[in-house]
């Protein structure tokens, strides 16, 4: 199995969180004022994404940057709900 590079992991995390909200790529991109084409390329790992855009995406998904990156995709364990509620950056 091929190891996922950083852009692929970021894209998978976006797709995972967006899917959990039941939002299409198009409606989510519109809600954060981002091009659907750009978002699609980020989600498949074809585009590097700036930290500013990761922050914008995370806010649109209703999570903090800490929650966004606190995933097994990035080598961490997911926060428990009580930890997430009290987590501060």
Predicted regions and their residues:
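A short, Lys/Arg-rich alpha-helix, primarily the initiator
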Residues: 1-20
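DNA-binding alpha-helical recognition surfaces that contact promoter or target DNA
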Residues: 12, 16, 30, 41, ...
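Residue-level signal for the short linker/turn that defines the boundary of a DNA-recognition helix
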Residues: 12, 22-23, 49-52
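Residues within the helices of the helix-turn-helix
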Residues: 15, 26, 55
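Alpha-helical residues within the helix-turn-helix
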Residues: 19, 30, 59
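Short alpha-helical DNA-recognition segment
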Residues: 22-44
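DNA major-groove recognition helix of helix-turn-helix/homeodomain DNA-binding modules
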Residues: 33, 52-67
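Short, charged recognition helix plus adjacent turn
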Residues: 59, 69-89
């Amino acid at each position: 199995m091929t190891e996922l590079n950083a852009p692929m992991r970021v894209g998978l995390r976006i797709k995972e969180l967006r899917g959990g909200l039941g939002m299409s790529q198009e409606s989510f991109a519109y809600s954060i004022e981002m091009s659907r084409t750009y978002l699609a390329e980020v989600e498949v790992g074809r585009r590097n994404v700036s930290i500013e855009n990761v922050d914008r995406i995370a806010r649109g998904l209703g999570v903090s940057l800490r929650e966004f990156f606190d995933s097994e995709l990035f080598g961490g364990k997911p926060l428990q709900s009580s930890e997430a509620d009290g987590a501060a950056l």
